[in-house]
């Protein structure tokens, strides 16, 4: 409930309504206008307006209306003493500021000290949807408030499903940070008291607030009940931290620390550390389980660090460090992993830690980096190649002495290191010259030629002796020609979709392309292999394809709006004039697979991406990858992901959310490994969404691993949320899609 004390200050927005300056008054048709110094005129209208010069008192009776700017006050009666600056209004008092509303029977306020009271008050704050009542609300000092017999809810119903009540609450020193003291707070659910405290105290601040986080409760059939709690500590304006104390049943206690900082706008980062002494491991080290060649010990941990920083002269530094004590940690505690790290661990089967920095100019770029890889498929990384370091320099395409010729440059120095196996230093220099032109103002033509020089100095393990520098030179040349056809359609041609996305015109473009690429055969068998740079294949091939685009022009163009690409389809193929290609089945073919990419971006209702490679000899796909998200106006969602690489990967994943009867959602996820013929994980649940609260439950079923080293595990947890107040538990990510 951080910052909820701010609602009390809204009781006193009326203090901004007036100041001790002359008024504009209207009695019938008569009016007098006098301008205030700061906020414009105060306008008073009433059936009867009286001014007593002796007491310097204005009295207004009957349909009183007082207004200044977007603030307005209505009442049956009002009185302002211009000497004491006391304002009193009574009888059906209604105060508005924008969409915020205060109703009360009586208000008393000193417009100079801005201290006062309101009685029998009802308050509505639009932004937070707060409905507040109080028998008496009082501002008794600077940043000092008191509310008696009050209630709070975010429900719009006259009989709210839930509410908080309090006998008295007092808040002090809001601006500097202080304490709120509540007497007799009670939480009601459908008029039934379910939680009572005789007394409570809470810190109040205008900025971030330290305190305990609401705990999360769950259950695992393998390890028993789970209770996850934490403490948030905002110890500086530019730094904060969260401490986690989780009880994971038979596993025992798991601790965590997350530290966040933002020293400047361009220097910020986050560090996370987690530790558990896993009690499920046997007491005897000789009996520790071995999974995929790794021994799982008692003490298990992980840390993840992200950092970015800018230096003078536009130099920058970024880092992303990921480390786990054992690879099984990625499965047992995957909720600890940052989202990008989780994707790498599942798809690329590796954890990557990288630190890089450099500088970008208009026409050049300099990048230096170190990269360390943790291969999660291997028990040891002794033979895994690490880049320590790699320095790259790029010259972007630019004219040569303002001629039609352009040049660009790709260059790098890399040092490859590992505990076991060949190490090497490599220098790579690749300058290129290109000549772009237009033929008959219809065809786009570009030819290019480049010379690539690569130097190696290898070190043999274990003696670390060098075989001296070795070199490889090769030529890369090519040409490409393309054109573009297009047709423009009026938005009324596709009326429904044009109105839905507010598009005035559509443009369909077709871009056929043909190109040629040549690189001679070079002797490189004796050179080490670390990445794609180390093996440049003999190339003598023609490439042809076609690209289609669907572009929409918005009805109203603003500063940031413009033509938007809603869809794109690319189809391409290579034909070898030299060595044949080798397909997934190991056969030699002169025609490559037909590659294709398709994506649609009709968000929020439909977004899809598809890519694949079709073998033209078997007329079957060697690879297919599909990702689609569909949503309707009822907020139903379907997410489908399918991956198929012949002989290596075959999986399908579903995430869905369906609205049944009005407030009830059903949701689920299902991940299936088609290659192994077994399901991987299933998540099912339901959520009830009322206007001001929601509640749900989640059942998670994790299947055993294909090698049977991990047994099946089932988890269950519930969550509950009060609108704009807080939540207990954690809802699945796809409920927020």
Name the predicted role of every residue range.
Residues 17-29:
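Bacterial Sec-dependent signal peptides at the C-terminal "C-region" and cleavage site
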Residues 8-19:
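Bacterial N-terminal signal peptides
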């Amino acid at each position: 409930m951080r910052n909820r004390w701010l609602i009390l200050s809204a009781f006193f927005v009326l203090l901004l309504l007036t100041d001790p300056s002359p008024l504009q008054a209207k009695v019938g048709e008569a009016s007098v206008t006098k301008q205030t110094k700061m906020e414009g005129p105060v306008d008073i209208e009433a059936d009867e307006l009286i001014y007593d010069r002796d007491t310097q008192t204005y009295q207004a009776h009957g349909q009183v209306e007082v207004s200044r700017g977007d603030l307005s006050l209505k009442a049956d009666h009002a009185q302002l003493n211009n000497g004491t600056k006391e304002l009193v209004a009574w009888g059906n008092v209604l105060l508005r500021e924008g969409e915020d509303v205060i109703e009360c029977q009586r208000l008393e306020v000193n417009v100079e000290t801005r201290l006062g009271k309101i009685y029998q008050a009802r308050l509505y704050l639009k932004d937070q949807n707060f409905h507040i009542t109080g028998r008496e609300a009082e501002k008794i000092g600077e940043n000092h408030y008191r509310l008696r017999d009050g209630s709070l809810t975010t429900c719009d119903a006259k009989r709210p499903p839930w509410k908080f009540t309090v006998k008295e609450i007092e808040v002090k020193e809001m601006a500097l940070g202080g304490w709120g003291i509540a007497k007799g707070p009670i939480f009601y659910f459908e008029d039934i008291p379910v939680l009572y405290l005789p007394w409570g105290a809470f810190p109040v601040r205008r900025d971030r607030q330290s305190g305990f986080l609401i705990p999360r409760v769950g259950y695992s059939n393998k390890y028993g009940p789970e209770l996850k709690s934490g403490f948030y500590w905002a110890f500086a304006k530019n730094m904060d931290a969260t401490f986690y104390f989780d009880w994971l049943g038979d596993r025992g206690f798991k601790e965590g620390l997350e530290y966040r900082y933002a020293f400047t706008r361009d220097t910020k980062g986050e560090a996370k550390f987690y530790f558990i002494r896993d009690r499920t491991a046997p007491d005897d080290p000789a009996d520790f389980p071995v999974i995929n060649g790794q021994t799982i010990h008692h003490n298990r941990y992980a840390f993840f660090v992200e950092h970015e920083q800018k230096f003078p002269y536009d130099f920058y530094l970024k880092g992303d460090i990921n480390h786990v004590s054992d690879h099984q940690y990625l499965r047992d505690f995957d909720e600890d992993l940052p989202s990008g790290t989780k994707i790498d661990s599942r798809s690329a089967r590796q954890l990557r830690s990288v630190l890089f920095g450099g500088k970008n100019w208009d026409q050049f770029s300099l990048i230096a980096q170190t990269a360390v890889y943790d291969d999660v498929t291997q028990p040891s990384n002794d033979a895994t190649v690490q880049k320590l370091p790699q320095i790259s320099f790029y010259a972007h395409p630019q004219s040569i002495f303002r001629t039609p010729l352009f040049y660009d440059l790709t260059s790098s120095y890399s040092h490859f290191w590992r505990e076991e196996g060949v190490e090497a230093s490599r220098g790579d220099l690749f300058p290129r010259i290109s000549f772009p032109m237009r033929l008959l103002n219809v065809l786009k033509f570009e030819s290019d030629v480049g010379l690539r020089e690569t130097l190696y100095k290898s070190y043999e393990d274990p003696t670390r002796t060098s075989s001296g520098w070795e070199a490889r030179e090769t030529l890369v040349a090519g040409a490409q020609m393309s054109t573009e056809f297009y047709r423009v359609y009026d938005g009324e041609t596709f009326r429904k979709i044009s109105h839905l996305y507010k598009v005035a015109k559509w443009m369909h473009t077709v871009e056929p392309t043909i190109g040629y690429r040549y690189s001679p055969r070079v002797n490189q068998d004796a050179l080490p292999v670390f990445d794609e740079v180390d093996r440049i294949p003999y190339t003598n091939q023609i490439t042809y394809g076609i690209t289609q685009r669907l572009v929409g022009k918005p009805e109203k163009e603003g500063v940031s709006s413009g033509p938007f690409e809603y869809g794109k389809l690319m189809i391409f193929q290579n034909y070898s004039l030299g060595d044949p290609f080798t397909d997934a089945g190991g056969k030699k073919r002169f025609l490559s697979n037909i590659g294709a990419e398709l994506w649609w971006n009709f968000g929020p209702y439909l977004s899809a991406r598809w890519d694949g490679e079709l073998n033209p000899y078997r007329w079957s796909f060697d690879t297919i990858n599909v990702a689609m998200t569909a949503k309707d106006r009822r907020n139903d969602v379907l997410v489908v992901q399918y991956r198929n690489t012949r002989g290596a990967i075959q999986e399908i994943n579903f995430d869905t959310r369906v609205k049944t009867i009005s407030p009830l959602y059903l949701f689920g996820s299902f991940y299936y490994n088609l290659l192994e013929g077994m399901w991987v994980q299933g998540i099912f649940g339901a959520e009830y969404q009322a206007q001001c609260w929601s509640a749900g439950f989640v059942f998670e079923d994790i299947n055993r691993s294909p090698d049977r080293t991990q047994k099946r595990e089932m988890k269950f947890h519930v969550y509950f949320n009060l609108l704009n107040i807080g939540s207990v538990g954690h809802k699945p990510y796809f409920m927020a899609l």
